[in-house]
A protein has these predicted regions:
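Receiver (REC) domain switch/active-site residues of two-component response regulators
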Residues: 155
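Substrate-binding/active-site clefts of carbohydrate-active enzymes
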Residues: 1-2, 6-152, 164, 169-173
Length: 173
């Protein structure tokens, strides 16, 4: 972190630190089964995954960054889960309304019209099951994750696929 601060940078952004799909062979091979985009396929909203480390390691990194005046921005995904739905935690499934329920009002319908706000916020994007972000139980579950990130030292967030996150005043079916 000292080198980052000395180079004039005031912030770093992490990849998503949530639990995510590992793939085969533990997912450690970035060019094989442990692809970078697995970080964007949450299996739960708890800190820690097989490539970026544990909650304690994240906290230690934040503490080190703050020693040098470097802020930590965390990339977060609130919109969807992994398509490997059998890997998604029961807690997340329950908070999101259930995969077979489905997770969102659009079900497993593929998104084809990116200009349609209802479709953008309720349909699957790229085969990734949409989460019903309008659901209060999911909001509470997700904010518990965000608050844990803050408790560990996160200073800010970048929301991936922000335009696909449904809001309470969005159109309904």
């Amino acid at each position: 972190m000292g080198d980052i601060a000395a180079a004039g940078f005031s912030a770093v952004q992490t990849s998503p630190i949530n639990e995510c799909l590992e793939g085969e062979d533990g997912g450690m091979d970035l060019y094989g089964n442990g692809k970078w985009y697995y970080h964007y396929q949450p299996t739960d909203f708890k800190i820690g995954n097989y490539q970026l480390g544990t909650r304690d390691e994240f906290k230690a990194m934040c503490d080190e960054a703050h020693k040098y005046g470097v802020k930590v921005i965390v990339d977060v995904i609130a919109n969807h889960t992994t398509p490997a739905t059998d890997e998604v935690s029961e807690d997340l499934i329950e908070a999101g309304g259930g995969i077979l329920n489905p997770l969102s009002q659009g079900g497993r319908t593929p998104l084809n019209d990116f200009g349609d706000r209802l479709a953008c916020t309720t349909y699957e994007m790229g085969g990734l099951p949409d989460i019903n972000t309008e659901r209060p139980s999911f909001q509470k579950y997700f904010f518990n994750y965000i608050n844990d990130c803050i408790a560990c030292g996160a200073d800010g967030f970048r929301y991936d696929t922000a335009k696909h996150i449904g809001l309470s005043d969005d159109p309904k079916r």
